[in-house]
Amino acid sequence: MSSTGPGRRVCRQARIGHVLMGGTAPVVVQSMTNTDTADAAATALQVFDLWQAGSEVVRITVNSPEAAARVAEIRLRLDDMGCTAPLVGDFHFNGDRLLRDYPDCARALAKYRINPGNVGKGAKGDDKFAFMIRQAIEYDKAVRIGVNWGSLDQTLANRLMDENARRPHPLPAEAIMREALIISALDNAEKAVGLGLSPDQVILSCKVSHVQDLIAVYRELARRCDYALHLGLTEAGMGSKGIVASTAALSVLLQEGIGDTIRVSLTPEPGESRTKEVVVAQEILQTMGIRSFTPLVTACPGCGRTTSTFFQELAQRIQGYLREQMPLWRAEYPGVEMLNVAVMGCVVNGPGESKLADVGISLPGTGEVPVAPVYVDGEKTVTLKGERIAEEFQAIVDAYVRKNYGEGGAKRRRVIAVRPA
């Protein structure tokens, strides 16, 4: 059973290294490191981990001479590890000086992120911005003009507030702040293009920390330009709050066809892997039917009929196993990301959901006969029982992948046939 994702806004297509963004390209998942970039080994390792998790573009902080001096080394380390993720340099305050003093850094990055709110004020700020754009032109790099609510150009914001105060019926302050974000992004994009940067190499973002503000800003930004757009709720927070807030904001915009790349800005729990933000971004796109990254595991939430936790443990085990296999499977079994596996806990919905999946198992609920029928492509093929249900079901999933997505497999042929040349 499949669903069709939403359409896409028509926009220009940018190129970040080998990754296309915007136009007809898939929505790109990206992430950001939290290591000290001056520590090249640690930063390269975290970039590699994020890339292995599925991040297609990774941003690193470039905030000091020590950091800028190590960017080229980070790129070389990644190349040696076989990591192809393009690197984005996140510049604030001193980006012009760092790009000038460290040309190897300028060359090694695939995209520069420039925040107009902290480049500088007046003529000096204009000169710094112009230098960074000229560097992007010289080295053929894309530029994200990333405006942020927390570092908005206050001169612009104050001017718009003053103009609003003179209106017969002033607009709410939040509406003016939203407009200031949009104007800042569009005006600076126009400056960059005026300096000679191709409009195809411009990506815009307007980051805020509240869901309704983000939706309103991006709807208007999308209406007023044809640049590729980077979506993300800044400072989304920790845990379930951060996941829910990001999902709520991004899903609305993506459903309207707005957004060409996304980043989920989660604050990791102490000791938690940075890769969680990548998984959440992928799952937003996959659950909306926009992209597929990992075989989907359908599992029931459990109820009074499922007093055993075995079905939950099996669902978790299968989901973890499939995700672990994807770095290898992605190359060996084209199309396997479309696989749907069902792990159900009782007879109420178990057989029905299992039949709709590619491979499904209906485990026994409370009071049911302790056997688990397995369905493959809608047909019951075997009934499992005993202590090795988990191992046997995993082996069935493995065999299905090899048969259907391996060399000569029917689903592999179908996937290759529909992929553009």
Swiss-Prot record:
InterPro entries the record matches: Dihydropteroate_synth-like_sf (IPR011005), IspG_bac (IPR016425), IspG_bac-typ (IPR004588), NO2/SO3_Rdtase_4Fe4S_sf (IPR045854)
GO biological process, one term: isopentenyl diphosphate biosynthetic process, methylerythritol 4-phosphate pathway
Enzyme class: oxidoreductase
Reactions that this protein is recorded to catalyse: (2E)-4-hydroxy-3-methylbut-2-enyl diphosphate + oxidized [flavodoxin] + H2O + 2 H(+) = 2-C-methyl-D-erythritol 2,4-cyclic diphosphate + reduced [flavodoxin]
EC identifiers of the protein: 1.17.7.3
Disulfide bonds: none
Keywords, comma-separated and alphabetical: 4Fe-4S, Iron, Iron-sulfur, Isoprene biosynthesis, Metal-binding, Oxidoreductase
Gene3D superfamilies: Dihydropteroate synthase-like (3.20.20.20), Sulfite Reductase Hemoprotein, domain 1 (3.30.413.10)
Keyword Secreted appears in the UniProt entry: no
Pfam families in UniProt: GcpE (PF04551)
Binding-site residues, [4Fe-4S] cluster: 300, 303, 346, 353
Cofactor: [4Fe-4S] cluster
Entry's cofactor comment: Binds 1 [4Fe-4S] cluster.
Pathway where it operates: Isoprenoid biosynthesis; isopentenyl diphosphate biosynthesis via DXP pathway; isopentenyl diphosphate from 1-deoxy-D-xylulose 5-phosphate: step 5/6
UniProt-recorded Gene Ontology molecular function terms: 4 iron, 4 sulfur cluster binding; 4-hydroxy-3-methylbut-2-en-1-yl diphosphate synthase activity (ferredoxin); 4-hydroxy-3-methylbut-2-enyl-diphosphate synthase activity (flavodoxin); iron ion binding
Family: Belongs to the IspG family.
NCBIfam families: ispG_gcpE, PRK00366.1
Role played: Converts 2C-methyl-D-erythritol 2,4-cyclodiphosphate (ME-2,4cPP) into 1-hydroxy-2-methyl-2-(E)-butenyl 4-diphosphate.
Record protein name field: 4-hydroxy-3-methylbut-2-en-1-yl diphosphate synthase (flavodoxin)
Encoding gene, per UniProt annotation: ispG
